[in-house]
């Protein structure tokens, strides 16, 4: 399924027409957070995390896509929403490295990524989201479609994974019956809300599981959404609300 999803994302389609001064486009956005190698030494450095230097909730965009990945930061420190991570992942989710302050932004595994790269595509960069329990420390929207007045955006899928910090906390504190769930809510401008979810970790009498492979999160049932918000829900309060995201794919149509 992963290969099918990637091929669908690579098949970028665009249709444009001019009719009495109007302009329309329909295409598939494939957000990988990957940049030219020249960008990394300046903006990321070695094994680091990028937080936008401005105080705007809008956060950052990728390439030409009208999608804003929201963040709330104070003094350069992420308080809620998205950051971009250049941190190398743990090897096959074995938590071999000593615990450190970067674990909140380090993917739990590099499994399936060629050359030890962190993302599912063998690239250097992925996004990390923090669901701060304090609403005042969260952006207004987690992902906002910039052309909502002139078009539509339908999220299709993305890859998700746990961070190293979350994996450690799950293994330290989870007991039978505990579950960690990621929810995505799509909201139209008229207030209509739809929701999809995926389990990031679950402990049962039969099996204990913690996600440590990049896994497809099917978001297609959200339908067109002007805003997408994420919630990381844990039955155990000792597990913080972080998760990794990459390969965000959405179908976009705009008319001007």
Where are these regions (language model features)?
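Bacterial Sec-dependent N-terminal signal peptides
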Residues: 1-5, 14-41, 252-256
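Residues that line or immediately flank small-molecule/substrate-binding pockets and catalytic motifs
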Residues: 8, 157, 162, 232, ...
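N-terminal targeting leaders for non-cytosolic proteins
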Residues: 24-139
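Solvent-exposed strand-to-loop "edge" motifs in beta-rich extracellular domains
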Residues: 38, 148-152, 159-166, 175, ...
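Short beta-strands within extracellular/lumenal beta-sheet-rich domains
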Residues: 131-154
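Short coil-to-beta strand junction motifs in C2/discoidin
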Residues: 169-182
